[in-house]
Amino acid sequence: MKPKMKYSTNKISTAKWKNTASKALCFKLGKSQQKAKEVCPMYFMKLRSGLMIKKEACYFRRETTKRPSLKTGRKHKRHLVLAACQQQSTVECFAFGISGVQKYTRALHDSSITGISPITEYLASLSTYNDQSITFALEDESYEIYVEDLKKDEKKDKVLLSYYESQHPSNESGDGVDGKMLMVTLSPTKDFWLHANNKEHSVELHKCEKPLPDQAFFVLHNMHSNCVSFECKTDPGVFIGVKDNHLALIKVDSSENLCTENILFKLSET
């Protein structure tokens, strides 16, 4: 005869079960949750000639949110965490009078140029102080540069200007970013850049690969009447100018001659 086995079943009352479930629920909701949010405040600085510089300094704000418990109520805590700040500088060309110029604001992290990173790029037509257009023509498998009068219905050639921060300190004759002068490269077509030939005192179009040579960089000066001038990086005091309806390198002896018409140029979106 088999012995009888007794089993006991502990019953949990409805009220007690609800209390247990509440405790478990409180434990789950008590866990913290972290979310990262990027914050990018913008700063503006107006330079002497009217050139407006916009800087954007980004950091991440990590928000720690503690979920509310049923007993203590809602608790909320925030703290800031600085992380991998990346600064972006954008040049607004109000000084040139070309605020409508098509602007490329894509991030340019081109580290191929030693110690220099491009700030931004603009696509614009280039003309002289007397409103003659700078044009480019392909002749015998090479590009020629002309200075000529165009008819009203003729389309102007465009040049891609890439802006860089130079190592030269800014002064009263020009504007800069963070105390440094701006440099530009000028490219009318892919893989071709304006190049200063100091030996021949000429301006030529050369096909170059990055890193670009120093002869392709020009220090930018903002002059009166919404004009700019381009000084050779490799030969200070020598500027891009106009001579016999062609671009040439012109020596400027003193700062008083920086306003000479044959070294002044205008930038326009049309």
From Swiss-Prot:
Effect upon mutating residue 165 to K: 8-fold decrease in affinity for IL1RL1
Gene Ontology MF terms in the entry: cytokine activity; interleukin-33 receptor binding
Source organism, top-level taxon: Eukaryota
Annotated compartments: Nucleus; Chromosome; Cytoplasm; Cytoplasmic vesicle, Secretory vesicle
Record's GO cellular component terms: chromosome; cytoplasm; extracellular region; extracellular space; intracellular membrane-bounded organelle; nucleoplasm; nucleus; transport vesicle
Reported induction: By infection with the parasite H.polygyrus.
Site (Cleavage): 94-95, 98-99, 108-109
Region: Interaction with RELA, residue numbers: 64-111
Tissues and organs where the protein is expressed, per its UniProt entry: Expressed at high level in high endothelial venules found in tonsils, Peyer patches and mesenteric lymph nodes. Almost undetectable in placenta.
Annotated GO biological process: antibacterial innate immune response; defense response to virus; extrinsic apoptotic signaling pathway; gene expression; interleukin-33-mediated signaling pathway; macrophage differentiation; microglial cell activation involved in immune response; microglial cell proliferation
Propeptide stretch(es), residue numbers: 1-94
Phenotypic consequence of residue 149 to K: Almost abolishes binding to IL1RL1
InterPro entries: IL-33, IL33_C
Chain residue ranges for the region called Homeodomain-like HTH domain: 1-65
Record's comment on post-translational modification: The full-length protein can be released from cells and is able to signal via the IL1RL1/ST2 receptor. However, proteolytic processing by CELA1, CSTG/cathepsin G and ELANE/neutrophil elastase produces C-terminal peptides that are more active than the unprocessed full length protein. May also be proteolytically processed by calpains. Proteolytic cleavage mediated by apoptotic caspases including CASP3 and CASP7 results in IL33 inactivation.
Alphabetic keyword roster: Chromosome, Cytokine, Cytoplasm, Cytoplasmic vesicle, Nucleus, Secreted, Transcription
Protein role: Cytokine that binds to and signals through the IL1RL1/ST2 receptor which in turn activates NF-kappa-B and MAPK signaling pathways in target cells. Involved in the maturation of Th2 cells inducing the secretion of T-helper type 2-associated cytokines. Also involved in activation of mast cells, basophils, eosinophils and natural killer cells. Acts as an enhancer of polarization of alternatively activated macrophages. Acts as a chemoattractant for Th2 cells, and may function as an 'alarmin', that amplifies immune responses during tissue injury. In quiescent endothelia the uncleaved form is constitutively and abundantly expressed, and acts as a chromatin-associated nuclear factor with transcriptional repressor properties, it may sequester nuclear NF-kappaB/RELA, lowering expression of its targets. This form is rapidely lost upon angiogenic or pro-inflammatory activation.
Family named by the database record: Belongs to the IL-1 family. Highly divergent.
Subunit structure: Forms a 1:1:1 heterotrimeric complex with its primary high-affinity receptor IL1RL1 and the coreceptor IL1RAP. Interacts with cargo receptor TMED10; the interaction mediates the translocation from the cytoplasm into the ERGIC (endoplasmic reticulum-Golgi intermediate compartment) and thereby secretion.
Domain characteristics, as noted in the entry: The homeodomain-like HTH domain mediates nuclear localization and heterochromatin association.
Name of this chain's protein: Interleukin-33
Organism whose genome encodes this protein: Homo sapiens (Human)
Lineage: Eukaryota, Metazoa, Chordata, Craniata, Vertebrata
